[in-house]
Amino acid sequence: MIDIAFSKLAIIGVAALVFIGPEKLPTVARMAGTLFGRAQRYINDVKSEVSREMELDELRKMHKDVQDAATDVERSIAQNISAADSSLHSAWDESDTDTNPLMEPPTLDQSSDKSKNFRKKKLAATSAVPSWYKRQSGQKSRVISGAARMAKFRPASARKSTPFFH
């Protein structure tokens, strides 16, 4: 703020001592300190208020720019939608007058060919891995329950051969 060196402060202090006197100098110094503090606080408040106003102006400008961009995007989307809508309506109107072979339902032969092709693709997808490889790698092809597995792999000595009815 103000550049005051120690020598200048000493000269001001000696002049104040001569003009004011030693009795009133402490009260005048206190009053000058409080006034100086008030002035500094007031200047800081004004600075912060000005910076806040500048930030608000910048935010208002940014808000306006964003709103303008949003309205431009909205207009362009609306134009694209209306253009697509008009082209769709014109294509629909043209298709009403002409018979389109793509819009006809498939015949019975076509649908049966499609289902046969699906079965062939499904069979090719499931049998892509040979069964000998499945057996060798240990992939299970059939799943059995836990009780059936226990009965299958139980040793002969552990099996009971008691009749069901006594």
From Swiss-Prot:
Any single GO CC term annotated in Swiss-Prot or TrEMBL for this entry: TAT protein transport complex
One Pfam entry name: TatA_B_E
InterPro entries (alphabetical): TatA/B/E (IPR003369), TatB (IPR018448)
Origin: domain of life: Bacteria
GO MF terms held by the record: protein transmembrane transporter activity
TM ranges: 1-21
Primary site of residence: membrane
Lipid bilayer topology: Single-pass membrane protein
Keyword Magnesium: no
UniProt-listed GO biological process terms: protein transport by the Tat complex
Positions of the UniProt region annotated as Disordered: 85-146
Keyword Ribosomal protein on entry: no
UniProt KW keywords: Cell inner membrane, Cell membrane, Membrane, Protein transport, Translocation, Transmembrane, Transmembrane helix, Transport
Protein role: Part of the twin-arginine translocation (Tat) system that transports large folded proteins containing a characteristic twin-arginine motif in their signal peptide across membranes. Together with TatC, TatB is part of a receptor directly interacting with Tat signal peptides. TatB may form an oligomeric binding site that transiently accommodates folded Tat precursor proteins before their translocation.
Protein name per Swiss-Prot or TrEMBL: Sec-independent protein translocase protein TatB
